[in-house]
Curated annotation (Swiss-Prot):
Keywords: Actin capping, Actin-binding, Cytoplasm, Cytoskeleton, Phosphoprotein. PANTHER family: F-ACTIN-CAPPING PROTEIN SUBUNIT ALPHA, F-ACTIN-CAPPING PROTEIN SUBUNIT ALPHA-3. This is F-actin-capping protein subunit alpha-3. It is found in: Cytoplasm, Cytoskeleton. InterPro entries: CapZ_alpha (IPR002189), CapZ_alpha/beta (IPR037282), CapZ_alpha/beta_2 (IPR042276), CapZ_alpha_1 (IPR042489), F-actin_cap_asu_CS (IPR017865). GO terms for cellular component: acrosomal vesicle; cortical cytoskeleton; F-actin capping protein complex; membrane. The keyword Phosphoprotein applies. F-actin-capping proteins bind in a Ca(2+)-independent manner to the fast growing ends of actin filaments (barbed end) thereby blocking the exchange of subunits at these ends. Unlike other capping proteins (such as gelsolin and severin), these proteins do not sever actin filaments. May play a role in the morphogenesis of spermatid. GO terms for biological process: actin cytoskeleton organization; barbed-end actin filament capping; spermatid development. SUPFAM superfamilies: Subunits of heterodimeric actin filament capping protein Capz (SSF90096). Component of the F-actin capping complex, composed of a heterodimer of an alpha and a beta subunit. Component of the WASH complex, composed of F-actin-capping protein subunit alpha (CAPZA1, CAPZA2 or CAPZA3), F-actin-capping protein subunit beta (CAPZB), WASHC1, WASHC2, WASHC3, WASHC4 and WASHC5.
Amino acid sequence: MSLSVLSRQDKEKVIHRLLIQAPPGEFVNAFDDLCLLIRDEKLMHHQGECAGHQHCQKYCVPLCIDGNPVLLSHHNVMGDFRFFDYQSKLSFRFDLLQNQLRDIQSHGIIRNENEYLRSVVMCALKLYVNDHYPNGNCNVLRKTVKNKEFLIACIEKHSYDNGECWNGLWKSKWIFQVNPFLTQVTGRIFVQAHYFRCVNLHVEVSKDLKESLEVVNQAQLALSFARLVEEQENKFQAAVIEELQELSNEALRKILRRDLPVTRTLIDWQRILSDLNLVMYPKLGYVIYSRSVLCNWII
């Protein structure tokens, strides 16, 4: 069905659904392509803002504020399309299409033991990320749910190269409650890759984890947490590489490749060229082939 015959409400749903399906690093490209089809600037701007806000949360889009990396996620959403950064103590809107911060406002935070723990965990996690991820980003957030304090650590590393026709994203999220003696860490590691040269190949791999950590003091907890993240991500990476190798050797070879057919047909190209009698119609702008050529080629 053509978009022109859809109601405005249905058209908004279609546009939104297509935009939120854009792979990491390809949102702006998808938006520009849809603009050529829709030709409604006001509608596209509104849907681009809404879908862009969701895209940032889904893929932990990184920013840089005052020289510090900030990862956008649904954990630091304040409402009304605004995000909050603990490091700079700023809230803002982010225009993904223009790659710009807007409506920046200052916000205070309560300096307590949990905020100090957040800073310590952030330092330990940053050391791990700098050691394992070239140009990787990380962030540690605080969140209170039903009077319970949680720390949320996010890691993101992407490689977007449209010139080479592929994009890739690695992200992980780790949540634990601030408890004495023992705490449980819940994590999720997610990898997505998109290759679009000659074929359109999407790969998504994820894993959920639960581990326990002993709590002695803040420094010990931060270091133990960083070691836990390193151990689990190393295991996940090794498993993904092994699975992809097996997939490449067996499944993809059977699915994407086939044996070439054996043919014993001999084509006499010299005969075809020598019999090629063309009738030119330059004013009409086209060429037709004589019947003898077609007969000789078919025989």
